[in-house]
Amino acid sequence: MKMEIRRDITGSILDIGGGGEGIIGRIYGGQVIAIDNREEELDEAPDCCEKRLMDATALQFPDRSFDHVTFFYALMYMNRDEQKKALGEAVRVLRPGGKIHLWDTDIDSAYPEPFVVDLEIVTDRFSVHTSYGIVKKDAQDADTILRDLHDLGLKTCRCEKERGQFHIVGEKAPEQ
């Protein structure tokens, strides 16, 4: 599936699961601190932003540290409990008025057969063809993630769904 990503985020960005292809880091460079819980994924990512080994369910940043938090095909690698904790941590480190940006996929079943999504990612700076795959018992869908964000007090700014892929943007209240 072809996916176009516009360079439209200003301010500081925490990219959760930012290892591997490092898509968000490649687009936004010095605006980004990319974290991943696997050192080999960080080693594989291009050296275009700051990279840190860290667990998304226990972020080592103070409250209200970032203007934006991104999850680019990262939630699919977490079970439901980890997803909820990671989203809660993302809201904690998000500044009032900041936004969470999620790109991911609906997964009906990824067990026992693996689930794989094949993407062609196009930006104004580069294009890359990659696949993301997982074997896990938890399913996921955009509606569940939307409910999680709502339960955390975020307002939905964008929810685009196309052929099983989704892009959701949630905004933290200015006074939250």
What do these predicted ranges mean?
Residues 84-96:
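A short glycine-rich, Lys/Arg-flanked "PGG" loop and its adjoining helix->strand segment in the class I
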Residues 152-176:
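Core SAM-dependent methyltransferase catalytic element
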Residues 57-69:
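A short acidic, Gly/Pro-enriched loop at the edge of an enzyme's catalytic core
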Residues 68-82:
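A short SAM/SAH-binding and catalytic strip from SAM-dependent methyltransferases
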Residues 23, 103-159:
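C-terminal alpha-helical "lid/dimerization" subdomain adjacent to the S-adenosyl-L-methionine
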